[in-house]
Amino acid sequence: MTWDGLPTQPLLMLLMLLFAAGSGSALAGCPGCGAGMQTGCRGGCVEEEDAGSPADGCTEAGGCLRREGQPCGVYSPKCAPGLQCQPRENEEAPLRALLIGQGRCQRARGPSEETTKESKPQGGASRSRDTNHRDRQKNPRTSAAPIRPNPVQDSEMGPCRRHLDSVLQQLQTEVFRGGARGLYVPNCDLRGFYRKQQCRSSQGNRRGPCWCVDPMGQPLPVSPDGQGSTQCSARSSG
């Protein structure tokens, strides 16, 4: 399942929503290394103080807080206080990495560090704004009509891209009801159509179910062995 070609802004929004759901889900009440949970803590863990009783899914997840540098993800135990689960630097598919537990617990960065690059105006953009300002002074009539970006119309999007935008709009309410488990995010190609293999997100160590679709998202018949193989035929896009 790949995430190539998807716009950065929707993916960042989805990541924030998924971690908001994770913090309020069953994993939030997981205990630390005590209460017989040590056997599930490979590589060591940090004991969480004042932890409540184990919630559903804690035993399966290991019930630990991950240390700095240890792997983490949306459906794995939380990072220790002061750490955040982040994709690796230059990760090509950050959303997928966090969904399958390939993130890393790292020191939380302050707001000033995250916004430093964004706050620095690019030289080309600054010069462009200066040029536009001078042009408006020379031609006052042109300033009456503000320049607006040309949004992509729904009719110009592929069916998978429209589906993805719809999912992002609904996530804000669904994740806070525990709807992040078994989440299905459409797997789109560069043209906005469905890739041949679609999968639900993994839960813990269990991989989510996958199925095959055509470019319009219609499910294709399962393999002749009846096992629902994820080896999709060449008839579908992707």
From Swiss-Prot:
Compartments, record wording: Secreted
Gene3D superfamilies xrefs: 4.10.40.20, Thyroglobulin type-1 (4.10.800.10)
Biased composition (Polar residues): 226-238
UniProt KW keywords: Disulfide bond, Glycoprotein, Growth factor binding, Secreted, Signal
InterPro entries, A to Z: Growth_fac_rcpt_cys_sf (IPR009030), IGFBP-6 (IPR022326), IGFBP-like (IPR000867), IGFBP_1-6_chordata (IPR022321), Insulin_GF-bd_Cys-rich_CS (IPR017891), Thyroglobulin_1 (IPR000716), Thyroglobulin_1_sf (IPR036857)
Basic and acidic residues composition-biased segments: 110-120, 127-138
Molecular-function annotations in GO: identical protein binding; insulin-like growth factor I binding; insulin-like growth factor II binding
Subunit text: Interacts (via C-terminal domain) with PHB2.
Name of the protein: Insulin-like growth factor-binding protein 6
Organism: Mus musculus (Mouse)
